[in-house]
Amino acid sequence: MEKNKTKKAAVCPVAKKCGGCEFQGMSYAEQLRHKEKRVRILLDSFGKVHPIIGMKDPYHYRNKVHAVFDRDRRGNAISGVYQKGTHKVVPVDSCMIEDQKADEIIVTIRGLLKSFKIKTYDEDTQYGLLRHVLIRHGFSTGEIMVVLVTASPVFPSKNNFVKALRKVHPEITTVVQNINDRGTSMVLGTRDVVLYGKGFIEDKLCGCTFRISAQSFYQVNPVQTEILYQKAIEAAGLTGKETVLDAYCGIGTIGLIAASKAKQVTGVELNKEAVRDAIKNAKRNQTKNITFYCEDAGEFMLKMAAEDQQLDVVFMDPPRSGSSEVFLDCLAKLAPKKVVYVSCNPETLARDLRILKKKGYQMQEAWPVDMFPFCDHVETVVLLSQQKPDDTIEIDLDLDELDATSAELKATYQEIKDYVLKEFGLKVSNLYISQVKRKCGIEVGENYNLPKSENARVPQCPKEKEDAIKAALKYFAMI
């Protein structure tokens, strides 16, 4: 584990063109330090942040692989990824973070196109058939689904094409044609046609079996997903007596895992296809204490609150944009005892935590989990609990004996420096600390604020150091 963390990452030959792995050339240990520091800067003021949970082997972890197809200047079929910020295709045969078998299948598909006279789709002319290929590989089951995204439902010799593909890769368990005839950048269309097999794969996670279709949302890193969801269930502290709501439930992953440890679980999701899969997943796992609804989660919670229904725990797993204030308002009105927030964006998480704090919810603990090695994303599980007015104790306080000076100072400049160096690895000056203090409305000595001459240029505290100093001030309860 330690040996792996300190070695330098192999540099990908298309790293600059692709742009998908922002941390190329950085050792895995450095990546983890960077991500943990980012989470700490944003969340330290809310509560306890645990060390980040990294991977033992941070390579080839993506069990969902997407390739876009195009033609080069000579008319040859190419497959790969879009160059960051463009729709120009960067040819890729293998990727250090993608499932190796999936990459092999994509190369085989590209090789079959010429013999079957299948043209790749051109976005400019809107001519051609094959637009994308999506591969999903069941980590625990080994099942493989191939999704061929075409611009037209007409797929000449499709049965022979599938036979030729399976001759090279007999491990493929199902092949689906997805029709996307829209002139948009969306990868998948709305219609699926099963060409071979059952049209979906299954995978196991935290003791539950899940049905995964072409359209299903399912986390792409199975090893870390197990850790992420186990941590979420552990944070909830379920004893078998709780009533639980799984908001943004998708295909029911968190809700079904929680069901074995709770009295009753309700899952709410707006996507109809996901709800259908969730219901099938409940039947597949013979889980009888869970019910799914195809509704807006916020409106659903408002109805529950109006009916005076009680909830012990709400799990929420919103998109990268975070939750909406409307949803958080509804959550506060329902007033569950605990909220477990699974976040894929620490910036929007911090924003939502500020809103929830105003509504009476305090973050207790946070666990960062590295779901995407070599990329700048980081997931975080956060436990919040309801802070009621009676969550107080009475004390006798003699104001005459209170030392106001010590209460105001809280921490010395050296203590702040030591904290910032220990927690963030940054060295800060007294000047920078005083600048941040002034921004936060804390009075400081004159010597730390004024230049020695009128024309002197005073250096301004960089944003990264300002955030770290603010975290220290919050730690010492000075802001």
Predicted segments, located by residue:
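DNA-recognition alpha helix
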Residues: 412-424, 434-440
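Phospho-regulated, low-complexity intrinsically disordered regions of nuclear gene-regulatory
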Residues: 410, 458-479
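Short Lys/Arg-enriched helix C-cap and helix-to-coil transition segments
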Residues: 444-454
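Short, aliphatic-rich beta-strand segments
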Residues: 70, 135, 142-151, 209-213
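Short, charged amphipathic recognition helices of the HTH superfamily
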Residues: 405-418, 429-430, 444
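Rossmann-like S-adenosyl-L-methionine
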Residues: 2-5, 157-406, 413-414
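Short cysteine clusters
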Residues: 12, 18-21
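Extended interfacial segments that mediate partner engagement and assembly in macromolecular machines
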Residues: 6, 22-120, 135, 140, ...
